[in-house]
Curated annotation (Swiss-Prot):
Keywords (A to Z) from UniProt: Amino-acid biosynthesis, Arginine biosynthesis, ATP-binding, Cytoplasm, Kinase, Nucleotide-binding, Transferase
Major subcellular site: cytoplasm
Swiss-Prot/TrEMBL site (Transition state stabilizer) positions: K9, K224
Record pathway: Amino-acid biosynthesis; L-arginine biosynthesis; N(2)-acetyl-L-ornithine from L-glutamate: step 2/4
Keyword Cytoplasm: yes
Cited function: Catalyzes the ATP-dependent phosphorylation of N-acetyl-L-glutamate.
A single GO molecular function term of this UniProt record: ATP binding
Protein source organism: Bacteroides thetaiotaomicron (strain ATCC 29148 / DSM 2079 / JCM 5827 / CCUG 10774 / NCTC 10582 / VPI-5482 / E50)
Subcellular location: Cytoplasm
Name listed for the protein in its UniProt record: Acetylglutamate kinase
InterPro entries noted in UniProt: AceGlu_kinase-like_sf, AcgluKinase_fam, ArgB, Asp/Glu/Uridylate_kinase
Length: 257
């Protein structure tokens, strides 16, 4: 029987506010077994960029990463946000190790080609070194992964945290029974976005497509669910979308084939 592993992705809103960060650290530390944490940090990057006089440009909710912005996100994601989380977990007895994709070549990416939009120094994941992560995990290390990768040519690349979580979970599913948890500001996928208790407990691909056609699921939840189904089809055992405060309670929406 294969060992179980939980990959948890948390957004910047959770890790950038003291109260929600403290709860996350406590809840994550309480999760037993092997685990990996992937975090965002976009709001902090926008704030620091503004303080440095650098304008943040967004298209369809995604950051345009020019050379100056790349310096900011590298500092903020790989430094400020990541090390705050690592220090907090160490204080709770979790042997956390902060990583970007460049560290030990754990995630290699390719710079996104220019199509309708030039996103700049943004990376699309090519390879995750699952054996390296597994070696760390078996030594009792808990990887804490920032949303940064590299191209192997000396360039850092800004990379979507949802994508890093999904690609990491898929790669590790060759070695573990992986549960991928996307933490969100809602209790799960909702039938009615104005009713926080209208959680859909389970959702299949066919049901998802029908919900999209009916307008029940829309906006940013669509790519999140697309990533979830892709992970399931690639061998991830289970995908859950839930509140960050519910990660230890086994609640939320479960994604089924």
């Amino acid at each position: 029987m294969r060992e179980k592993l939980t990959v948890i992705k948390v957004g910047g809103k959770i890790v950038e506010e003291e109260a929600t960060l403290l709860q996350l650290l406590n809840d994550f530390a309480a999760i037993s077994g092997h685990k990996v944490l992937v975090h965002g940090g976009g709001r902090s990057a926008t704030k620091i960029a503004a303080q440095l006089g650098i304008e943040s440009k967004m298209v369809n909710g995604r950051r345009i990463t020019d050379a100056e912005t790349l310096k900011v996100v590298t500092m903020v994601y790989g430094g400020l946000v990541n090390k705050n989380i690592v220090a907090g977990l160490q204080a709770r007895g979790v042997n956390a190790l902060g990583l970007t994709g460049a560290d030990m070549n754990v995630i290699r990416s390719v710079k996104r080609p220019v199509k309708e939009v030039d996103y700049g120094f943004v990376g699309d994941v090519e390879k995750v070194d699952a054996s390296l992560l597994a070696d760390l995990i078996h030594k009792g290390v808990v990887p804490v992964m920032a949303p940064l990768t590299h191209d192997g040519q000396g360039n850092m690349l800004n990379t979507n945290a949802d994508t890093i979580a999904g690609e990491t979970a898929k790669a590790l599913s060759a070695l573990f029974d992986v549960t991928l948890v996307y933490c969100f500001e809602k209790k799960g996928v909702l039938r009615d976005e104005n009713d926080d208790d209208s959680v859909i407990p389970e959702i299949t691909r066919a049901e998802f497509e029908q919900y999209v056609a009916d307008g029940v699921i829309q906006g940013g939840m669509i790519p999140k669910l697309e990533n979830s189904f892709e992970a399931i089809n690639a061998g991830v055992t289970e995908v859950v979308i839930t509140l960050a405060s519910a990660i230890k309670d086994n609640e939320g929406t479960r994604i089924k084939k």
